[in-house]
From Swiss-Prot:
Belongs to the metallo-dependent hydrolases superfamily. DHOase family. Class II DHOase subfamily. It holds the Pfam family Amidohydro_1. GO terms for cellular component: cytosol. Its EC number is 3.5.2.3. The keyword Metal-binding applies. This is Dihydroorotase. InterPro entries: Amidohydro-rel (IPR006680), DHOdimr (IPR004721), Dihydroorotase_CS (IPR002195), Metal_Hydrolase (IPR032466). One of its GO terms (biological process) is 'de novo' UMP biosynthetic process. Zn(2+) 2 binds at H34. Its cofactor is Zn(2+). Zn(2+) 1 binds at D107. GO terms for molecular function: dihydroorotase activity; metal ion binding. Pathway: Pyrimidine metabolism; UMP biosynthesis via de novo pathway; (S)-dihydroorotate from bicarbonate: step 3/3.
Length: 204
């Protein structure tokens, strides 16, 4: 609904769409994809085993002040849009709780640099190269590393009723600076956290 403010749409969606669906189909499994608000986090926590949600690394690490204060940072512009810090904190507490109904969802979007840095830029963060180390940094900050593997690898497939992946990756606590940009032919893509240092990296 274009009449609903972009920062209010998630809460309105819960009220007008999600709750009526769940009332009509109480045992329908629903994944609330890429939640961004305190209302959504609380709604999932108050729900039953048929309701889950994914959360992106950018919504755990940033809020709208990071995107807008002191100049627009187009590479943090994504949809659903970043919200107030109170919503960011609610998401962080949700993943730190260890609830098995929250799980990884990167929503990675590798838009070309010139399509992000324009008068009408594309929405999305290209976090595929470093999403796992970024999530690890969040869980470490929250003192919740014991829930990190489940959030990334176990909660999702168990919710969907799928077998767990038998392959594995290993992280090491080695600070790694993220590239400023990634060449793509004659173009380039700016990765999530470009130029910043993460304390975790994937082990070769």
């Amino acid at each position: 609904d274009p009449a609903v403010d972009i920062f209010d749409r998630e809460a309105r969606f819960i009220e007008q769409v999600m709750e009526p669906i769940r009332q009509h189909f109480p045992e329908l499994k629903i994944v609330f994809e890429h939640i961004t608000t305190k209302e959504a986090a609380q709604y999932v926590q108050a729900g039953n085993r048929f309701l889950g949600a994914t959360i992106t690394p950018q919504h755990l690490m940033f809020n709208r002040n990071h995107m807008l204060v002191g100049g627009i940072r187009p590479h943090l512009f994504c949809l659903p849009i970043l919200k107030r810090n109170v919503h960011q904190e609610a998401l962080r507490q949700a993943v730190a709780s260890g609830s098995d109904r929250f799980f990884l969802g990167t929503d990675s979007a590798p838009h070309l640099k010139h399509r992000k840095e324009s008068s009408c830029g594309c929405a999305g963060c290209f976090n595929a190269p470093n999403a796992i180390p970024a999530y690890a940094a969040v869980f470490e900050q929250l003192g919740a590393l014991e829930h990190f593997e489940a959030f990334c690898s176990l909660n999702g497939p168990r919710f969907y009723g799928l077998p767990l992946n038998e392959d594995f990756i290993e992280l090491q606590r080695v600070p790694t600076t993220q590239p400023e940009e990634i060449a793509l032919g004659n173009e380039s893509v700016i990765p999530f956290l470009a130029g910043e240092t993460l304390n975790w990296s994937l082990k070769d």
